[in-house]
């Protein structure tokens, strides 16, 4: 009597570089849409249609077609990225809210939320629809930033998180002041950098 032994292939300890890179690029598509809207001076809804929507569709397609031996790790990275993005966004917004609530600065960094919404809905920035759309886009950005980092750098030294935060901060400093209609100031830098630094301690698996 012959007993056949089935060998279970070992699970990969990391995703293929191409898979990680594509996942990260797709996750950053909402941020890329925002940057395109600002730089090209086009409505956010238009930039999102050509950048974010294809990126989201590609991410979903990657999720369901990733190689079987990578599926478990991919889903773990997906869950970790969503959690990291949520925690980082809460920390970022919480620090900004505290600084501005205590009147430590006169700048209102949250006005960007309504401008996001107005760019997506075409409605006035004071409407409830614009506010809801703006917060939704802000949350999507936060999730996307968390996902991109986890897919590329999960488990790496904390220096990677610092470098990633500095890159995001650099883009914000370059794009936001002119787009929001105020000049670069020490107050804006204080709020932005302090809030961004608070995201570096977010636990990432």
Please place each PLM-identified region on the residue numbering.
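Transmembrane alpha-helices
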Residues: 9-71
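Membrane-interface interhelical connector segments
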Residues: 102-129
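Hydrophobic alpha-helical transmembrane segments
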Residues: 133-147
């Amino acid at each position: 009597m012959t007993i056949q032994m089935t060998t279970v292939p070992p699970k990969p300890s990391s995703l293929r570089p191409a898979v990680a890179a594509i996942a990260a690029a797709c996750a950053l598509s909402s941020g890329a849409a925002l940057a395109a809207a600002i730089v090209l001076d086009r409505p956010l809804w238009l930039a999102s249609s050509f950048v974010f929507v294809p990126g989201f569709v590609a991410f979903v397609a990657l999720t369901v077609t990733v190689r079987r031996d990578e599926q478990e790790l991919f889903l773990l990275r997906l869950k970790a990225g969503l959690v990291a993005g949520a925690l980082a966004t809460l920390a970022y917004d919480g620090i900004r809210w505290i600084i501005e609530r205590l009147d430590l600065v006169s700048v209102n960094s949250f006005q960007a939320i309504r401008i996001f919404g107005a760019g997506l809905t075409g409605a006035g920035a004071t409407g409830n629809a614009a506010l809801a759309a703006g917060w939704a886009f802000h949350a999507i950005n936060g999730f996307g930033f968390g996902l991109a980092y986890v897919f590329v750098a999960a488990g790496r030294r904390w220096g990677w998180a610092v470098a990633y935060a500095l890159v995001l901060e650099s883009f914000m400093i370059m794009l936001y002041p002119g787009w929001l209609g105020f000049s670069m100031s020490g107050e804006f830098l204080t709020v932005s950098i302090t809030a961004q630094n608070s995201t570096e301690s977010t636990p990432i698996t």
